[in-house]
């Protein structure tokens, strides 16, 4: 049985996500896979490439052939060079850690509570008018 390491497409239209899978070469692109050995998310910045190096080494060792897109991913992660016995490539770009947003208190803001309302509330106006009318009728 001819085995290939290929990309299985997931996601929505214009939002692709791929799984790196080992499958029979005669199966459909998104068909049944023997094993899932990684992920590839090209729309993220930088794109995410997660590969299980042990399983890739095993499948390459037993004769699985990577497709061209998977071969490019394996070269970027260094798994292909490790299999061929070549020197490893430069490390991949890692996403920058997002700094926590400074809190309001850390900036120096002081919580003064609620200020006075610019407009009066309707219920309060009605009570004030009713009280004024009753005091006017008493006098």
Swiss-Prot record:
InterPro entries cross-referenced by the UniProt entry: Ribosomal_bS16, Ribosomal_bS16_CS, Ribosomal_bS16_dom_sf
Name under which the protein is recorded: Small ribosomal subunit protein bS16
Lineage: Bacteria, Bacillati, Actinomycetota, Actinomycetes, Kitasatosporales
GO biological process: translation
A GO cellular component annotation in the UniProt record: cytoplasm
HAMAP family per the UniProt record, alphabetical: Ribosomal_bS16 (MF_00385)
Keyword Ribonucleoprotein carried by entry: yes
Chain intervals for the UniProt region annotation (Disordered): 84-139
Pfam families reported in the protein's UniProt record: Ribosomal_S16
Organism field: Streptomyces coelicolor (strain ATCC BAA-471 / A3(2) / M145)
PANTHER family membership: 30S RIBOSOMAL PROTEIN S16 (PTHR12919), SMALL RIBOSOMAL SUBUNIT PROTEIN BS16M (PTHR12919:SF20)
Alphabetized GO MF terms: structural constituent of ribosome
Protein family according to the UniProt entry: Belongs to the bacterial ribosomal protein bS16 family.
């Amino acid at each position: 049985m001819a085995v290939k390491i290929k990309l299985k497409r997931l996601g929505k239209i214009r939002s692709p996500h791929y799984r790196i899978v080992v499958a029979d070469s005669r199966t459909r692109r998104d068909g049944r896979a023997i094993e899932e050995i990684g992920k590839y998310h090209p729309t993220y910045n930088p794109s995410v490439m997660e590969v299980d190096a042990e399983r890739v080494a095993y499948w390459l060792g037993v004769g699985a052939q990577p497709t061209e897109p998977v071969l490019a991913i394996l070269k970027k992660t260094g798994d292909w060079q490790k299999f061929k016995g070549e020197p490893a490539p430069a490390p991949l770009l890692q996403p920058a850690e997002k700094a926590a947003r400074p809190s309001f208190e850390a900036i120096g803001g002081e919580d003064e509570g609620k200020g006075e309302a610019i407009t009066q509330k309707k219920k309060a106006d009605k009570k004030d008018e009713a009280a004024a009318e009753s005091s006017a009728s008493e006098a």
